[in-house]
Amino acid sequence: MGANRDMISASKHFVSSKALLLVLLALCCASAAWAGQWTALGPDGGDVRSLAYDPQNPDHIFLGTSTGTLFSSTDGGKSWARFAHLGSGDDYVIDHLAIDPQSPNKMYAAAWSVETQQSGDLFHSEDAGQTWETLPAMHGKSIRALAISASDSKTLVAGAVDGVFRSSDSGKSWQKISASNSDIHSIESIAVDPKNSNVIYAGTWHLAWKTDDGGANWHHISKGMIEDSDVFSIIVDSTNSSVVFASACSGIYKSQNAGETFQKIQGMPFSARRTRVLKQDPANPAIVYAGTTEGLWKTIDAGKTWNRVTDPEVVVNDVMVDPRNSMRVMLATDRAGVLASTDGAHSFLTSNHGYTHRYVTAILADKSDPNTMYVGVVNDRELGGVFVSRDAGQHWIQNSKGLDGRDVFTLKQASNGELVAGTNRGMFILAQHATEWSPINDIVNRTGSRYVKTGQHEVHSILTARVSDIEITPTTWMAATSAGLFTSSNQGKSWNGGAVMGKEDFVSVRAQGKLVAVATRSDVLVSKDNGVTWQDSSLSTSISSIRGVSITSDGQIMFASREGAFRSPNGGAGWEHMQNGLPDKNISSISYDQNNQRLLATSTETGVVFESQDNGQSWTRGPDTGYPLRNISVVQGRMMASTPFDGIVMQPENEDHSASTGTATRRTN
């Protein structure tokens, strides 16, 4: 049960254990490291895993993500800045941040790898996060819980997949205090008695344990708990150590005798009992917050009664209460980012300015207003979809009404200004000045399908497949979908198509005049008569993951894939592997910048932009953005890229680049 508690839904790079061994010191650190690199524009929000404040200045707040990146705020969470990156890749989940209450320059960050589940690190900073190092004794451990003793801040306790570990010297040395052959493993939560650092509670993926003597002896504390309960969070009352709260997949439990027996708390619906975090108000111990997968719950009478104080759609990962002012509550959430309350959790507003953690799949600059841009995102359900900025990315608003939580893979704009979106379930159009997207999924020629009556006309079926790419030409709209290639000659009012040469699962389509190229993950099909007839381009059988196709103005076809970038100068009859300055594999996108007659490419292995002025025969290494890139565009003379975790990023205004105007038109997944 517990092993699957956190599903991090972004594509990430695999970081081998061998590579991790090369990074015993922090690989990225504070704000100076980001100077001169590209700027993240948004959209604001996304997943937040953890929050922590400086004990001597609670307006100084730190934020942990699911990709190893830390953010900080110096104004109480009103604005955020990218602060540091921990680990060598993008797979470290920072679920716990701890700051020494006696010496706030000492910080700790617990990490576990979403890729391997079994590895991770414990990071330590002595200078308020300016520099970080891994603690060697904990290197490689998947650390799921971390606590500092309130009575002795030199004492830390960490919970990992392989047991419980304790340090009595601020992390310099560590001892495993759980027996290697015991059931005390797969630790999910840790709590230390605020008055006695030898009393430690450990929640596992199967009930909880307690030691009264610093780990020399442990005993099961499960009386009153439902068997097979994953214990996600444990807190000990700051004023009365006999009172202990524990949250599990079966509900919330309270003990009034230091964990010897528990009583299940009533009043919360079963669906909301997956409580990821419990947090006690530091100024009022009768107030306890429960962050669940169905909203935030609050008790003001020490657990006798509970009320939900947010919408049930809010998934809460962490709760922070200002020690100076109990009215000020902040939440780390999935998809919504940081939510802040100034009235004791009666109401919340987003507080994400400067913080973005979104997987952007599409960037579109408005044809008539260069300051207006649109982006499509995935994985954020009702809080995602499409976002629009009308001030060149300084501010964003969600514009997803009618999409009903769909992922958006591609965005295009018709000649009349209408927007077209390809989603994980069909296509949608947003008319000019409209506030709601409308479906455009009528298919008129699916042989053998049952007739369905609509208000406008009779159609054979409704397209519900994934739409990975859309191409709009002066005469035809084309859609690459998981159910085939579809075309429309009436601006999307109806579509016809399906399988092409027996292939259906298309991921990309591009057209130049009558030349059309459409790709599955392993094949490229080419038409020289606008889709009337097709030919298979006979790619190597080694090609397994095509990410997108592109066509230059002189008719050369190119594609980006896991196996590298390939070019055909003869309409798909033959292919050559483009290298000569370009990485030989893991190309995430290749774009043709029509206005500047050049190719731009990105790779999943680097944040560098690659450029070719000779149709791919040779490549020059461009700027290192500091971000993992997926797709590249040129907007108002500056390069802009989508990322899997950091929204969209833009080239610095003073950075040397040859582009002057235009847009690179390739979109890949």
For each feature predicted by the language model, list its residue ranges.
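N-terminal secretory signal peptides that target proteins for export/translocation
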Residues: M1-S16
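Extracellular glycan-interacting surfaces
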Residues: V15, L20, L24-L27, A32-N669
